[in-house]
C-alpha cells in the first residue's frame, strides 16, 4: 500500500511520495509520452499489479545496463518519470503488455525494501519554464531542425510533424521530439535529467544537428554503393541481353567460345606434368568466373602464357660440321677459338644425342663481333636466335618476373624471349652481362645464377608462372667487355672465351670482304660505282680509326658510300669513283689520328709503355723531368693507387742502383723528380708500367735517351726483377699499330706469344727480359763515350744493399 503525499495538480516541489518502480531496458520515457511496454520479469509484473491495485501510477526509470536481468539499486538511473497506466494486457506466455503515459519527472530519494517488487521513495522535480526570447528562438530552431531531420528519416511521417507543430509548451516540445529521436540511452537520460527548458532545448538542438550530419553521410555512402551496384547490374543486364540476342541470331557466346577454344588448346598442347595440372586447375576456376570480372582476365592471361611457351617444341640441329664451318667462316673473319668451340659442341652432339647446352662468355673490346658471332652460331646450328640486352638492368624481376598478385604482372625477360622465339633450344645471347647493376629491388646477377647453371637450369622457376621450366637445352652465350665486372659466382658458371682485337691485316680483310659489300648494298650502290683499293682501306684504318674492333671502320666506309651515292644520283648510275687519299680526306675530313711511331726521335726521360683497356691495347708515353730541389717526388696523370705504388717501387729501385747506373747517389737530396703519364684526364691503373717508369727515371737522371721505336711492358720489383703481365696480345697489337719495331715483354709471358698472329711477329721484334738490367741495355741509346753500367762498383753496391738488409734474398725466394 502506498500513498501519494501531494495532490495531482502539484507536479513540482520538494514533497516526497512512494510508489512501485518498473525498471526499463533500452528506453527512456518522457512526460506526455504514450508508449507500450512488454513486461516479463516477476518483480516488474508484481510492481504493475501493485500499481493497478491502487491508483494506477508507477515510476519508470531506465537501467544503466540493459543486459542486467536482476538490477540492483546501483543499476538504475535516479531520475525517471511518474506514469499513468492506461491499459494492461496479459499474454499467454506470461508476459504483460502495458500502455503507459508519462506524467512528470521525479527523482528516487531512497529504495524501500520489499520482497516482491521494487518500491521507491520519490521527490518531484520542478522544471524552470520561464518564457523568454531565448526559449522562443530555441523552440523555433529545434522545430526547424526536426523538420530537416524528417526529410532524411522517412520514419518521421507527416502525422508526427503535425503533432509536434501543434505543441506550444517548450518543455513538452523538447520531451516529445526527444522521444522520437533515435538517440542513445545515455543522451536521452541526460535530456530527461535537464530541468532547465532552455538548456534542454539547446542540447536537443545540437543532438538533432549531429544526427542530420550522420544521416547525410550515410546517404552519400549509400548513393555511391547504389551507383556502383547499378553499374554492375546494368552491365550484367546488358551482357545477358547481348547473350540472348546472340542466341536468337544463332551467334555463339564470345566467352563460351573462348573457353571452348582454350579447352582445345589445353588438350592439344604438350605440357610438363606440373604445368598440365596447373592449367587444368586454373581453367576449372575460369569456367566458374564472371567473364567481366578482373580476376577472370588475370587467369585467362596466365593460362595463355603457359600455353604459348615452347615446352617441348624445338628445332632440329644441323650436325654437318663442314657446312657449319663454311657458315661461320662466311660470316666472320678469324675468331678461331670460338669457332673451334662450336664445332666441338656439334661433334659431341652428333655422338651423344642429348647433351646440356654450353654456356659461353665472349669477352673482348667493342666492335670485335661478339654479338654477331652469336647470331652466326645460331645460323650454323640451324637454331633460332634471341638476344637480350642486360645493360642497365637493375631489377631482379626483369629476369624472374613478378608474382601474379601484382597488377599488370608479367613473366621475366627469359620466359618472354622463349615465347617470342617459339622453341626451347634457341641460341640465347645475353648481351653486356658486365653492365648489370643492383639496387633496393634486388640483384639481377644473382637471378642469373640459376639461369646459367647447367646443374640447376633444368628447373628454372619464374615468379609469374610459378612452374619449373627446362632451360637445359638452350645454348646460352653471354658477352662482356670487362671480365672483372662480372660477379665471381656468375663468372664461375661460364666458359670464358677471350676475343682479342683485330690486327691491321684482319681489319683489311674484313673491310674488303664484308664491310664494303655490306655498306654498298645498304646505300644502294653496286661494287662498280666505287673502288676501295687495299691501300685506301689501310689509309682509312690507320688515319681515321683507332679501335680494337671494326665498328668505326664500318662507320667511315658507310660515310664514304653515302657521299658516293650523292654523286651517283647527280651524274647517273654508270658513275664510278676511284678513291684516293685526297678524295678520302674530302669525304671524311682531315685525318683523325697520326699513324707512325709514338715519338719521332729518341728523347731523354721519355719511355713508351703499353696499356690494356676495355677497348683494346694502347701505347702510353711516360715522361720524367729532373729539377734542382730538395728531393720532392711528384707523380701526375690521374694514376690509381697500384700505378702510384709501381712508380714508388721504380724510384726505390733506381736509388738502390744509383752508383752502378752512374747516377749521383745523393740525387734524391739535391733534385726534385716529376713523373707524368699523359693523357691527364684519363684514369690509369695497374702494375704493368713499372719497367717503363724505371726506364724513364733512369734516362732522366743519367741523361741518356730512350729508343723511340721501342715499347715495353712489365711489373718491376725492388730487386729489379720483371714480373709477368696480362693483356699481352692487345698490347702487341697496339705497338704494331703505332709502327714500333721492338717490344720488351717479361720472360714469363713467352707462353702467350702463341696467341699472337705470325704475321705480326714477323713485323715486330719481341724480346724477352727478366731483369731491369736487360731492359735498360735494350732500351737506352748509350753514347759511344759512355757506359751504362759501372761494373767496378757493382760489388760495393751489392755489399751496401746486404748491409742494409742481411740475407733477405733467400727469404724473398722462400716467400
UniProtKB/Swiss-Prot annotation:
- Domain Lon proteolytic: from-to ranges: 601-782
Q: Pfam families under this entry?
A: AAA, Lon_C, Lon_lid, LON_substr_bdg
Q: What class of enzyme is it?
A: hydrolase
As recorded in UniProt, its EC number(s) are 3.4.21.53
Q: Where is this region: Disordered?
A: 793-815
CDD domains recorded for this chain? Answer: RecA-like_Lon
Catalysed reaction(s) here are:
Hydrolysis of proteins in presence of ATP
Q: Tell me the residue numbers annotated for binding ATP.
A: 364-371
Major location category of this protein:
cytoplasm
What do the Gene Ontology cellular component annotations say? cytoplasm
Q: Extract the PANTHER family matched here.
A: ATP DEPENDENT LON PROTEASE FAMILY MEMBER
Q: How does it assemble?
A: Homohexamer. Organized in a ring with a central cavity.
The family line of this record is:
Belongs to the peptidase S16 family.
What is the name attached to this protein's record? Lon protease 1
Biological source species = Syntrophobacter fumaroxidans (strain DSM 10017 / MPOB)
Query: What would be the name of the gene that encodes this protein?
Result: lon1
Amino acid at each position: 500500500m502506498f500513498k501519494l503525499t501531494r495532490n495531482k495538480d502539484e507536479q513540482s516541489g520538494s514533497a516526497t511520495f512512494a510508489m512501485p518502480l518498473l525498471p526499463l531496458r533500452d528506453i527512456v520515457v518522457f512526460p506526455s509520452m504514450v508508449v507500450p511496454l512488454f513486461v516479463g520479469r516477476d518483480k516488474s509484473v508484481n510492481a504493475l499489479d501493485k500499481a493497478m491495485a491502487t491508483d494506477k501510477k508507477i515510476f519508470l526509470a531506465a537501467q544503466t545496463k540493459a543486459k542486467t536481468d536482476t538490477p540492483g539499486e546501483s543499476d538504475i538511473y535516479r531520475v525517471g518519470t511518474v506514469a499513468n497506466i492506461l491499459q494492461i494486457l496479459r499474454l499467454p506466455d506470461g508476459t504483460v503488455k502495458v500502455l503507459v503515459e508519462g506524467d512528470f519527472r521525479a527523482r528516487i530519494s531512497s529504495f524501500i525494501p520489499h520482497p516482491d517488487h521494487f518500491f521507491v521513495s520519490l521527490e518531484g522535480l520542478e522544471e524552470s519554464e520561464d518564457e523568454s526570447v531565448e526559449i522562443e528562438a530555441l523552440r523555433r530552431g529545434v522545430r526547424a531542425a526536426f523538420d530537416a531531420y524528417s526529410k532524411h528519416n522517412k520514419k518521421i511521417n507527416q502525422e508526427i510533424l503535425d503533432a509536434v507543430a501543434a505543441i506550444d509548451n517548450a518543455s513538452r516540445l523538447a520531451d516529445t521530439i526527444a522521444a522520437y529521436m533515435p538517440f542513445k540511452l545515455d543522451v536521452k537520460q541526460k535530456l530527461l535529467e535537464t530541468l532547465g527548458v532552455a538548456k534542454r532545448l539547446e542540447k536537443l538542438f545540437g543532438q538533432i544537428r549531429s544526427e542530420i550530419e550522420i544521416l547525410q553521410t550515410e546517404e552519400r555512402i549509400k548513393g555511391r554503393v547504389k551507383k556502383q551496384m547499378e553499374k554492375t547490374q546494368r552491365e550484367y543486364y546488358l551482357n545477358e541481353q547481348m547473350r540472348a540476342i546472340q542466341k536468337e541470331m544463332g551467334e555463339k557466346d564470345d566467352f563460351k567460345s573462348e573457353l571452348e577454344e582454350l579447352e582445345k588448346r589445353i588438350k592439344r598442347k604438350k605440357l610438363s606434368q606440373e604445368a598440365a595440372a596447373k592449367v587444368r586447375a586454373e581453367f576449372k576456376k575460369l569456367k566458374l568466373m564472371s567473364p567481366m570480372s578482373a580476376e577472370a582476365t588475370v587467369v585467362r592471361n596466365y593460362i595463355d602464357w603457359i600455353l604459348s611457351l615452347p615446352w617441348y617444341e624445338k628445332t632440329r640441329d644441323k650436325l654437318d660440321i663442314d657446312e657449319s664451318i663454311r657458315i661461320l667462316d662466311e660470316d666472320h673473319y678469324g675468331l678461331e677459338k670460338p669457332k673451334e668451340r662450336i664445332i666441338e659442341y656439334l661433334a659431341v652432339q652428333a655422338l651423344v644425342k642429348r647433351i646440356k647446352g654450353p654456356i659461353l662468355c665472349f669477352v673482348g673490346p667493342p666492335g670485335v663481333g661478339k654479338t654477331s658471332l652469336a647470331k652466326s652460331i645460331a645460323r650454323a646450328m640451324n637454331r633460332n636466335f634471341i638476344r637480350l640486352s642486360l645493360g642497365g638492368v637493375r631489377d631482379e624481376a626483369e629476369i624472374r618476373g613478378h608474382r601474379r598478385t601484382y597488377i599488370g604482372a608479367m613473366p621475366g625477360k627469359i620466359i618472354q624471349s622463349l615465347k617470342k622465339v617459339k622453341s626451347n633450344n634457341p641460341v640465347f645471347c645475353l648481351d653486356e652481362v658486365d653492365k648489370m647493376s643492383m639496387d633496393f629491388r634486388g640483384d639481377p646477377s644473382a637471378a642469373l645464377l640459376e639461369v646459367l647453371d647447367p646443374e640447376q637450369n633444368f628447373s628454372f622457376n619464374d615468379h609469374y608462372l610459378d612452374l619449373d621450366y627446362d632451360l637445359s637445352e638452350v645454348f646460352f652465350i653471354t658477352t662482356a667487355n670487362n671480365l672483372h665486372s662480372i660477379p665471381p659466382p656468375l663468372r664461375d658458371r661460364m666458359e670464358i672465351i677471350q676475343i682479342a682485337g683485330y690486327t691491321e691485316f684482319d681489319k683489311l680483310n674484313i673491310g674488303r670482304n664484308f664491310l664494303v659489300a655490306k655498306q654498298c648494298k645498304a646505300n644502294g650502290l653496286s661494287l662498280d660505282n666505287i673502288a676501295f683499293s687495299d691501300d685506301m682501306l689501310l689509309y682509312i684504318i690507320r688515319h681515321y680509326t683507332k679501335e680494337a674492333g671494326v665498328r668505326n671502320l664500318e662507320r667511315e666506309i658507310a660515310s664514304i658510300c653515302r657521299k658516293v651515292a650523292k654523286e651517283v644520283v647527280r651524274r647517273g648510275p654508270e658513275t664510278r669513283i676511284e678513291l684516293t687519299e685526297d678524295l678520302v680526306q674530302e669525304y671524311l675530313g682531315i685525318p683523325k689520328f697520326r699513324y707512325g711511331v709514338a715519338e719521332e726521335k729518341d728523347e731523354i726521360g721519355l719511355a713508351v709503355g703499353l696499356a690494356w683497356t676495355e677497348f683494346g691495347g694502347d701505347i702510353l708515353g711516360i715522361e720524367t723531368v729532373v729539377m734542382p730541389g730538395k728531393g720532392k717526388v711528384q707523380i701526375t696523370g690521374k694514376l690509381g693507387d697500384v700505378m702510384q705504388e709501381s712508380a714508388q717501387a721504380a724510384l726505390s729501385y733506381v736509388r738502390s742502383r744509383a752508383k752502378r747506373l752512374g747516377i749521383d747517389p745523393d740525387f734524391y737530396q739535391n733534385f726534385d723528380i716529376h713523373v707524368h703519364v699523359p693523357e691527364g684526364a684519363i684514369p690509369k691503373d695497374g702494375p704493368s708500367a713499372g719497367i717503363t717508369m724505371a726506364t724513364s727515371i733512369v734516362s732522366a737522371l743519367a741523361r741518356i735517351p730512350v729508343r723511340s721505336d721501342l715499347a715495353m711492358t712489365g711489373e718491376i720489383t725492388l730487386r729489379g726483377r720483371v714480373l709477368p703481365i696480362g693483356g699481352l696480345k692487345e698490347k702487341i697489337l697496339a705497338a704494331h699499330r703505332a709502327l714500333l719495331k721492338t717490344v720488351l715483354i717479361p720472360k714469363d709471358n713467352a707462353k702467350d706469344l702463341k696467341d699472337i698472329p705470325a704475321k705480326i711477329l714477323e713485323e715486330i721484334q719481341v724480346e724477352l727480359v727478366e731483369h731491369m738490367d736487360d731492359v735498360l741495355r735494350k732500351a737506352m741509346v748509350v753514347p759511344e763515350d759512355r757506359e751504362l753500367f759501372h761494373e767496378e762498383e757493382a760489388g760495393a753496391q751489392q755489399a751496401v744493399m746486404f748491409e742494409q738488409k742481411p740475407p733477405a734474398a733467400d727469404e724473398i725466394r722462400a716467400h
